[in-house]
Amino acid sequence: IIQKAVELGAAGVIPVATRNAVVKLDEKKAEAKVRRWQAIAESAAKQSKRSYIPQVGMVMSLKEAFSYIEEQKFDLSMIPYELEKGMDGIKQVLGRLAPGQQIAVFIGPEGGFDEEEIKLALRMGVKPVSLGKRILRTETAGPAILALLMMKLEGAF
């Protein structure tokens, strides 16, 4: 996931612990994982000829991640959600994007976001979007939405 995110233009990756995440990391294991993920990000940046090496942040809770994007004044935050219907939401989001904007994308865990996490996202102003009729795996959803963002922000449409 880290490798593909970096290759597709992500400026950074913050691992988020959610209720349905299959892997639960204690603090010591999380630090080791983040170091490994950072090495993957560096390798992917080099391979894809990026001039900037995206940083992998420390693992945080979903609530902490929502607070972080609020504090950092992201221009837009969205959450692909399998119960969101139709493609109008993602079309509207893509239509409003402009180069240079800070965009946060929350990709769900293997078990998906639970209802309370989605309610929290809505309260925090995170826009739920559909990625189509199919339910995508975590490792597919991230690259799918990043490819759409890259195409839009790099002027392909």
Each language-model region and where it sits:
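RNA substrate-binding interface of SAM-dependent RNA methyltransferases
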Residues: 1-78
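Active-site/ligand-binding-proximal alpha/beta "capping" segment
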Residues: 72-73, 77-112, 117-118, 127-129
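Structured adenosyl-cofactor binding patch, chiefly the S-adenosyl-L-methionine
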Residues: 115-157
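Glycine- and other small-residue-rich loops at beta-strand/loop junctions that grip anionic moieties
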Residues: 54-58, 110, 134, 138
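A short acidic, often aromatic-flanked loop/helix-cap motif at beta-alpha or helix-coil junctions
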Residues: 60-66, 85-87, 136
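Short, glycine/charged-enriched secondary-structure capping and boundary segments
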Residues: 28-30, 92-95, 119-121, 144
